[in-house]
Regions:
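Helix-loop-helix module between adjacent transmembrane segments
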Residues: 27-32, 104-128, 134-135, 139-169, ...
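Extracellular loop-to-transmembrane helix junctions
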Residues: 9-48, 91-128, 304-310, 411-421
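Transmembrane helix-loop junctions in multi-pass membrane proteins
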Residues: 4, 34-39, 81-86, 95, ...
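Extracellular/periplasmic helix-exit of transmembrane alpha-helices
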Residues: 113-122, 127, 223-241, 249, ...
Length: 466
């Protein structure tokens, strides 16, 4: 097991130290400038379209609304990356890692806009709802079926297996730390609950996510806000520490700026998924009047995840004065920090929050896998086998080591992200055209723009569902 972990860590170091940092930041900067900072100038419009109901004029009653698509994607985003991932980033990369998480969210949200807009453009009609995602725009946009199948395999393994093992591992660690529960029992219960929901299909997943996600996010933000207000006099010092740790001379001399940068980008991507190619799978299912609407919705999801919830975790840890020497790591660091702030109840709260956050992620992660298994083959038997394997990986995660679980997630996430970034870079001009069309309609006085493919000849043959 140690040999496997060392081999995987070696590959991860190459991918995350060079390849992905260049690609993620390069795409993020390009999309930010090409869209003229869409993630900032259209923030009010993001809030407005969040309340749009499903467009049922032609598609029927089963398609999900913008908010439900937002909730399912946020269910995947808001998970252990927000509590355990941020803690790991701060423990390994120092407080400066938080700064780089902010940067990758602010810039990377433009990548989220492009990928989700493209997913809407290339979506297809399924039996229950629309279907789509990177595999579809690789097949129908680039004409590269092999690339679509490769991505579908990567995301099915990454989210259904690797990420879900991380979520399960973190839940078990939190429950064992707070209540002394046996990981085997917790893992068995998680497996049963997971299988019960994922055999219910996207409609059940959407309904469960739209209830769990707002409740858990608001509860966690409320607690963190209380801690920030209680320590308000220390807030300037904490922010100064974050920024100085990202650029300071001491960090440069010690070589930790690179660690902060790498951890910030790695854990930031694991948490907000901007440019990874995951959120477009659920963005495509939404029934909207214009592809840009889901691009805006998923951009808002990145902000909610990183700038709000991840920041809450970082502040809780830094306010508490918990040791960042590696003696406490992962979710245990977050639990320890909250215990220092509000007493034993804090650790219990984190255990409950982790269960809700991570379990909702397991549900959302599974959907990404299912959507891509359907892309590879229509056989129901394959889908049923995949569901059972997902359940098996949830149980595996409960028993595996934390280090191996994270390493597997990092390497599969890296390969699928590279695949997706190449695709959206090649197709990005189409997203820019759609954004221009949307803005022109808004400026002409149309409150809720409607996409008419006949007005954009360049996209007419691409938009089957429009």
């Amino acid at each position: 097991m140690e040999i496997l972990n060392n081999w995987i860590s070696g590959i991860n170091d190459i991918l995350w130290s060079y390849v992905l940092i260049i690609m993620l930041l390069g795409c993020a900067f390009r999309f930010t400038f090409k869209t003229r900072f869409v993630q900032f100038r259209m923030f009010r419009e993001m809030i407005r379209v969040l309340g749009d109901s499903a467009n049922k004029a032609h598609e029927g009653e089963k398609h999900i609304s913008s908010f439900q698509a937002f909730a399912v994607s946020l269910a995947s985003r808001v998970g252990t990356g927000n509590l355990a991932g941020v803690a790991t980033a701060v423990a390994v990369g120092g407080p400066g890692a938080v700064f780089w998480m902010w940067i990758i969210a602010l810039l990377g949200s433009a990548s989220a806009f492009v990928e989700s807009t493209l997913a809407q453009l290339y979506k297809r009609k399924g039996k229950e709802s629309f279907i789509g995602g990177p595999a579809y725009y690789m097949r129908y946009g680039l004409g590269l079926n092999w690339m679509g199948i490769l991505f579908a395999i990567l995301i099915s393994v990454t989210f259904g297996f690797a990420f879900n093992s991380v979520q399960s591992n973190t839940i078990c660690a939190a429950m064992q730390g707070s209540f002394g529960f046996d990981p085997r029992i917790v893992g068995a219960v998680l497996t049963v609950l997971t299988l019960a929901i994922i055999f219910g299909g996207i409609q059940r997943i959407a309904k469960v996510s739209s209830v769990i996600v707002p409740v858990m996010a608001l509860g966690y933000v409320a607690l963190a806000s209380g801690i920030v207000l209680f320590n308000i006099t220390e807030l300037p010092a904490v922010i100064k520490l974050i920024v100085s740790s990202a650029f300071g001379w001491e960090q440069a001399a010690g070589g930790t700026i690179g660690a902060a940068l790498m951890q910030g980008i790695k854990r930031g991507l694991f948490s907000n998924e901007a440019g990874m190619g995951s959120a477009p799978n659920v963005a495509a299912t939404a029934s909207v009047t214009h592809p840009v609407k889901q691009g805006l919705i998923q951009t808002l999801g990145v902000f909610t995840d990183t700038l709000l919830i991840c920041t809450c975790t970082a502040f809780i840890i830094l306010f508490s004065g918990a040791p960042l020497d590696g003696s406490v790591n992962g979710v245990q660091l977050t639990q320890h920090a909250l215990t220092l702030e509000v007493g034993k109840a804090g650790g219990i709260f984190v255990a409950v929050a982790i269960f809700l956050f991570a379990f909702s992620s397991i549900i959302g992660n599974y959907y990404y896998g299912e959507a891509n298994i359907r892309f590879i083959t229509p056989k129901k038997s394959v889908l049923y086998i995949y569901r059972l394997l997902v359940g098996g990986m949830v149980m595996f995660g409960a028993l595996a080591s934390l280090e191996l679980a994270w390493s597997l997630a990092d390497i599969t996430m890296a390969f699928m992200t590279i695949c997706n970034l190449v695709a959206i870079s090649l197709l990005s001009k189409q997203a820019f055209l759609l954004l221009h069309d949307y803005i022109v309609q808004k400026r002409s006085g149309i409150k809720s723009p409607v996409f008419d493919k006949n007005k954009l000849p360049e996209l007419k043959d691409k938009a089957e569902c429009w």
